[in-house]
Every structure is written in structure tokens, then in C-alpha cells.
Amino acid sequence: MQRYPTKQILVGNVKIGGDAPISVQSMTFAKTRDVKECLEQINRLYFAGCDIVRCAVFNKEDIVGLEQVKKESPLPIVADIHFNYSYAVAVSKFVDAIRINPGNIGGKDRIKAVVEACKERNIPIRIGVNSGSLEEQFENKYGRSVKGMVQSALYNIGLLEELEFTDIAVSLKSSDVYNTMQAYRELRPFTSYPFHLGVTEAGTTFHATIKSAIALGGLLLEGIGDTMRVSITGELEEEIKVARAILQDTGLQKSGLNIISCPTCGRLQSDLVSAIKIVEEKTKHIKEPLNVSVMGCVVNAIGEAKGADVAIAFGKGNGLVMRHGEVVARLKEHELVDRFLSEIDDEIKQRASNNG
């Protein structure tokens, strides 16, 4: 697919837009003034594969805490500002980017103060439009609609451009999947600033995964989007796991295993479900892009194996292990997974040797 060309901005050491890879973001839910807990969550996100983290600034104690957090964070920090523009001005001295909500940050004079502060340190601003908190002028005219979100974004982009500020990212979030997608689609032709994708208030893991896969995955397949967050209530690592899976399954991230497995049926004569769980757990650290298949019977296993780097075809009490469609071992069922994992390791080593 071809991505829409966008301006590239820099959040800390992470490039967003242009030809940069789609980055994954998340947000701490600890009180930012609780430096220890906030850093604990940031480190969890870092090891889960997050690229950028956002922290809420709710009061002056959060400003003090965030400065310390920034000193120790392994990830670039975006300050999330609502209502009080002076907090944005204060934290702009040390954070990597500012997110403002145009629905509650205040008028032109306040936005100007934030822009001037960000200019001094050359840090970007994300215009974070949210359907649940549109400016009164747009909600009164358009309601909490796609058009209202798009008009809010265009208006605020114009304000920043009038102040000669163009290090901008834009998000248009709704809890409604269709409205989220349409808002990004309708705004895209009118601006070349990078888009931060997300469905807001998406819920717990099950519903958030479905909503995000549809909305974010759909937009990414249309070439729309430069950075993203999967919002899941209270589940830090799951946000990153789901986001990375969306990127992999849309073909935008070539990292880790693409595991193909059958849904099982009446022909199954082995414990395929347990085998899959073991494979997922034992291979979650792998970064090398590999296609592997774990199939329960021979009906589709041979065909899938032809397109896989490494494959298992289970039978009744035994099965096959294959590399690039060729059988390398016929083993008893309890031996298959270990041999399969060994072949994956060997495939990775062989690639490294060939590339070295």
C-alpha cells in the first residue's frame, strides 16, 4: 500500500510522518506526581515495545513530578494538557511534545502562549480533537459529528500556522469506529501533517481490540496514519501487544512471527491449542520476521507449509515438521513443538549467517 505523504516531525528521538515507521504510543494512568509509579509504568511500556509515552498533567505537583520522570524515562514524553494552558508552558521546558485539547485549552491568546513556548525548544504540538469535548462553536453548529471534528482540526491548524508553527500532529478521536475513520478520511486531503490514530474510550481488552483493529487497521490499509495508540482500559502491555499485531497484520511492521494456525474442527486428533500457546510464549521475544504455521491436520497443512518458513502438521499421535515446504522430520506428537522451535532458531541463525 502507499502511505499518504506527510510532514515529518520529531518527538524526542522518534520520527513521526514522512517515511518513518508507524510508531506506537501509550499513556500512563498513574498520577504523574507519583514519580516512582509513573516510571514503573513507563518501563513496563518500554519493555513491551512502546515508542512514545504520554503523561497527564493535572496540577502543579504533576509538573514537578513530570520533570523528574523525564530525566529517568527511557521513552520520549508527551505532556497531556487539558484546561490549563499555563501547565503546557511550564512543562514545555523539558518534555518532548505537548498534546492540547482545543475543546478546553482556551482562546487564541492561550494557544499563542503555548506555541511560543514550544517554539523556544523546537518541540511539536499534537492537536488532539475529541468528539466528546469539541469547542462550543463547533458542537453548536455541527453537533458531536465527523464534520465538527474536522472543522475543529482545520481551525486549530490554521491558528498554529498563523503563528508560523508547523511542527504539528493531529488526532481526531471518537469512541465510535465509523466516525473515527470518517474524520481522518475527510481531513486527510486538506493537510499534510502527520496523523496520530486512535479510538478513544475504546473499553476493555476484548472490545478495544476489535474497535482498534477495525478503525486503525482499516485506516492504515488506506495509507492513512503515522503514529497510533490502542486505548485499553487499565492494560498497558496489552495496548502495545494489540498495536504491534495490527501493524504486523497490515504488513506495516516486519518483525516477529506471523503465526498461522487453524481454528480446529472434527478432524483434529491432537492437542493443537496447547501447542499454539507454547509456541506463542516461547517465540514472543523473536524480532526476525518469520511466517510459521501450526496446523491440526493434513487438509490445509501442506498448502500452508509451502508458504511458511517453518511449519508443523499434526496427525494422530504424530506429525511432520517442515522448512520451506520440505519435510525435515516425522515425529511423535510430544516431540513436535520442541523440534519446531529448534527449526525456528536454526532458520534465524541461517539468515544471520547469510546476511553477515
Curated annotation (Swiss-Prot):
List membrane-spanning regions: none
Biological process per Gene Ontology, one example term: terpenoid biosynthetic process
- Asked if the Swiss-Prot or TrEMBL record annotates the protein with the keyword Lyase, the reply is no
Cofactor binding remark: Binds 1 [4Fe-4S] cluster.
Role this protein plays = Converts 2C-methyl-D-erythritol 2,4-cyclodiphosphate (ME-2,4cPP) into 1-hydroxy-2-methyl-2-(E)-butenyl 4-diphosphate.
**To which protein family does this belong?**
Belongs to the IspG family.
Protein name in UniProt: 4-hydroxy-3-methylbut-2-en-1-yl diphosphate synthase (flavodoxin)
User: Which species is the source of this protein?
Assistant: Campylobacter fetus subsp. fetus (strain 82-40)
